[in-house]
A protein has these predicted regions:
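C-terminal structural segment of proteins
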Residues: 1-160
Length: 160
């Protein structure tokens, strides 16, 4: 009972699909707000859910970062121990945040993420897929792919 979405479905298709609009309007809205129409037409729901974290510091130019000193996300320094999180200087770990527009909605909807690698398939609840670490931010191994998302239909729920 629910809706399966392949990870390769475009964000535009997610935003405009009648079943998603009817049963999961928050997801349709989130997908419709991603970037520009051209990127929604080419970008996929799986790609949006697995986006790298963003850091206001790391997303600066190399000369800018070199002048200030390097960070945990991208040390670029032979002295990795010297790298700190410039977002939260007292933190021992990187605190870059998720930039996925659809991830919070998937967590709220109790979505399940279906991952696959050569050894098989596993299912991870959306709420357990994301970690509180800017560098090691997804609960998946490097050889795993997000292949589909299952959205459960909850009886009696009404969304506006």
């Amino acid at each position: 009972n629910g809706l399966m979405i392949g990870s390769g479905v475009s964000l535009s298709e997610v935003a405009e699909h009648p079943e998603i609009l009817n049963n999961f309007p928050a997801l349709a809205k989130a997908a419709s707000l991603v970037s520009a129409p051209q990127l929604r037409n080419m970008g996929t729901i799986g790609g949006n859910l697995c986006l790298d974290t963003r850091c206001n510091y790391y997303n600066q130019t190399f000369p800018w970062r070199k002048a200030l000193g390097f960070c945990l996300k991208k040390p670029e320094s032979p002295m990795q121990n010297d790298a700190i999180c410039w977002v939260a200087r007292s933190s021992p770990k990187c605190l870059a945040v998720s930039s996925s527009d659809c991830a919070p909605v998937m967590v709220a909807l109790d979505a399940e993420f279906h991952l696959m690698n050569p050894d098989g398939k596993r299912i991870v609840p959306a709420g357990e897929f994301y970690k509180n670490d800017g560098m090691d931010f997804l609960n998946k191994t490097p050889d795993e792919l997000l292949v589909s998302i299952r959205l459960p239909l909850h009886e009696g729920w009404k969304m506006n």
